[in-house]
């Protein structure tokens, strides 16, 4: 699963997809104009952004307002993988997958009201850094950083590139490598040049365009199928002409229009959807660097909360503009989107296991008018870029702050900035090398396992964060062994999934009952419970962390005014070299050559000599960056809006249950 709580239906990469149409001049013009515009926004935001310090490059100088944060929370999570995967799963199984989107509202409120206040008062830039301050020592922080980077490279980047490539191939018939390399190049260019401010502004722009394009397509598609009543009738009949004898795989599910499904036989059982999914969603929305980094860049806590509420409202819509259009695509083109005969599917999309993933691109190609089609293609590219940009930026933050600083504790600010940029280039190279792996891997399994990987690897992390915030008695030994045991159990289940695989239509299911009968969302709950037991037992058997070390690191101490005594850290940087200080960069008397100036601008290094901050300035800056005080009026506005959001959310669950 991409580390976002959306399942994606399995479909291998198409081998040869013929161009379905030649692009009209208007379509090409729209794509070109759009990309020029995106680059311009990226460059404009980087010129006015504070890119010269680590805090500025990675946290947008803690100056963002609520609306770009809310839009960015949405678009970081709504990549092209979501469009293709969510629509494909909707086409294959109906509405239930939309519950993955609606669940996010609750967890986003938890992010703004519970997690972010603790992170801000703790004064942290990355999630592993919080764990280091909370527990001391390095092993948890390094474990978390390395695990996150592996998850990013193997799940997020590969999913996004796979989905983007699938979209380009189905809709344009372009060469896969050329289009992907161009996309990655443009993405890397403005991530490197702009840092997080460029990412957040371009994200906000992309969200607007994505949502408009998706809404236009939604109305065209609903009009074509006869609106919701027409969809109810046509989806029930949407079976392909060619079927596998003596099977029912080709028939639409009888519970397709219900979100809550049987707890034992359902493809997405309702207790798993409510409780198990919340475990995965808490990892994604409350402890994952990509998402939390957005909220930490807010100018104050009220802006972070309002961003969460806006993000929650925006997450209502994918059910209507992604999942339902996926179902409409099956209703309109059942022979292609719903194919089950392996040879027929191979002809249609180059994938024997089924073609439900082509549901969304198929709609774009068949239904969009000229010009709008170009816009939708641009939007899908934008979704891919937005996701990749977030991952590149957050991965380089993790690498520089948590891994590079371990290797070189005395690295200067300038060195950290350069290493962050170089690491992004390394990620781009890895991504391009990864493309043939995705093409040749059985991607039917790859996509199933991306969901599974999240349920097998994330519950222990979720558990550690929740317990660290709410229970001061949890110590480093408890957290570490909880993570380790959870990792081993999750890996055992994951390896079993790889070994046994999922049977296709007409095959008998020979998997052991642990795989066959325990849904991955149930497994997430079991793993959570196991990790809680291990953490509790080990923590109670070992010495507690003295309270002087926990000031402003737990929910109960977040408002404390006491001085926190940091836990011993053998790797700590020498005093005075933290984020807030800006080192003097000796400038030559002669102005550097133009190419050197351009290179320094690209890496966020200014030629002007900066003075070290005085002790008073440093304390004032630190106080501003760790303040969770709120204006009473805005606090009330945020609370009321959060209540309205959750009430609307409950109504929607009830209506479609």
Swiss-Prot record:
InterPro entries: Na/Glc_symporter_sf, Na/solute_symporter, Na/solute_symporter_CS
PROSITE patterns: NA_SOLUT_SYMP_1, NA_SOLUT_SYMP_2, NA_SOLUT_SYMP_3
Keyword Membrane found: yes
Protein name from the UniProt record: Sodium/glucose cotransporter 4
Organism encoding this protein: Danio rerio
PANTHER family associated with the record: SODIUM_GLUCOSE COTRANSPORTER 4, SOLUTE CARRIER FAMILY 5
Subcellular location: Membrane
Gene name for this UniProt entry: slc5a9
GO cellular component terms attached to this protein's record: plasma membrane
Record Pfam families: SSF
């Amino acid at each position: 699963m991409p580390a976002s709580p959306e399942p994606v239906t399995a479909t291998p990469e198409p081998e040869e997809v013929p161009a379905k149409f030649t692009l009209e001049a208007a379509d090409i013009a729209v794509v070109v104009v759009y990309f020029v515009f995106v680059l311009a926004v990226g460059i404009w935001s980087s010129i006015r952004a504070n890119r010269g310090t680590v805090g500025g490059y990675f946290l947008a100088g803690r100056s963002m307002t609520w609306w770009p944060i809310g839009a960015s929370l949405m678009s970081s999570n709504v990549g092209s993988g979501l469009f293709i995967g969510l629509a494909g799963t909707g086409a294959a199984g109906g509405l239930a997958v939309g519950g993955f989107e609606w669940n996010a509202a609750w967890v986003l409120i938890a992010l703004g009201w519970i997690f972010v206040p603790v992170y801000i008062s703790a004064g942290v830039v990355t999630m592993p850094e919080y764990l280091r301050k909370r527990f001391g020592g390095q092993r948890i922080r390094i474990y978390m950083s390395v695990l996150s980077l592996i998850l990013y490279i193997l799940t997020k980047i590969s999913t996004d590139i796979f989905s983007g490539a699938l979209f380009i191939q189905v809709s344009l018939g372009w060469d896969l490598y050329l289009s992907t390399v161009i996309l990655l190049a443009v993405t890397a260019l403005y991530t490197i040049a702009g840092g997080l401010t460029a990412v957040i502004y371009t994200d906000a722009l992309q969200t607007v365009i994505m949502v408009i394009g998706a809404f236009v397509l939604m109305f065209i598609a609903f009009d074509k199928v006869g609106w919701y009543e027409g969809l109810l009738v046509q989806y029930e009949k949407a079976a392909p002409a060619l079927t596998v004898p003596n099977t029912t795989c080709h028939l639409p599910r009888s519970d397709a229009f219900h979100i809550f499904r049987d707890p034992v036989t359902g493809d997405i059982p309702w207790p798993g959807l409510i409780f198990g999914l919340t475990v995965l969603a808490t990892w994604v929305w409350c402890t994952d660097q990509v998402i939390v980094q957005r909220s930490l860049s807010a100018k104050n806590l009220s802006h972070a909360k309002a961003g969460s509420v806006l993000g929650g409202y925006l997450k209502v819509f994918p059910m209507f503009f992604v999942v339902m259009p996926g179902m409409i695509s099956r209703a309109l083109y059942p022979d292609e989107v719903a194919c089950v005969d392996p040879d027929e599917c191979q002809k249609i999309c180059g994938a024997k296991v089924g073609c439900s993933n082509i549901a969304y691109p198929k709609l774009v190609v068949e239904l969009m008018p000229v010009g709008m089609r170009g816009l939708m293609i641009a939007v899908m590219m934008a979704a891919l870029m937005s996701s990749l940009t977030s991952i590149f930026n957050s991965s380089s933050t993790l690498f520089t702050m948590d891994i590079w600083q371990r290797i070189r504790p005395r690295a200067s600010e300038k060195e950290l900035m350069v290493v962050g940029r170089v690491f992004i280039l390394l990620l781009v190279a890895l991504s391009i090398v990864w493309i043939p792996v995705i093409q040749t891997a059985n991607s039917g399994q790859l996509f199933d396992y991306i969901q599974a990987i999240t349920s097998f690897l994330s519950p222990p992390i979720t558990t550690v964060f929740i317990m660290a915030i709410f229970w001061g008695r949890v110590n480093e030994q408890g957290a570490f062994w909880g993570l380790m045991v959870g990792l081993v159990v999750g890996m055992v289940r994951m390896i079993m999934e790889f070994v046994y695989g999922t049977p296709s239509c007409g095959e008998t299911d020979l998997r052991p009952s642990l795989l066959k009968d325990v849904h991955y969302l149930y497994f997430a709950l079991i793993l959570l419970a196991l990790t809680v037991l291990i953490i509790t037992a080990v923590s109670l058997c070992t010495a507690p962390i003295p309270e002087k070390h926990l000031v402003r690191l737990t929910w109960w101490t977040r408002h404390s005014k006491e001085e926190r005594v940091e836990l011993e850290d053998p790797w700590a940087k020498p005093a005075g070299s933290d984020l807030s200080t800006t080192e003097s960069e000796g400038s030559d008397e002669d102005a550097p050559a133009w190419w050197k100036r351009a290179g320094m601008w690209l890496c966020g290094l200014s030629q002007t000599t900066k003075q070290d901050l005085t002790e008073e300035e440093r304390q004032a800056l630190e106080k501003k960056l760790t303040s969770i005080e709120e204006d009473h009026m805005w606090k009330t506005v945020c609370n009321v809006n959060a209540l309205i959001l959750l009430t609307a959310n409950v109504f929607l669950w009830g209506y479609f249950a």
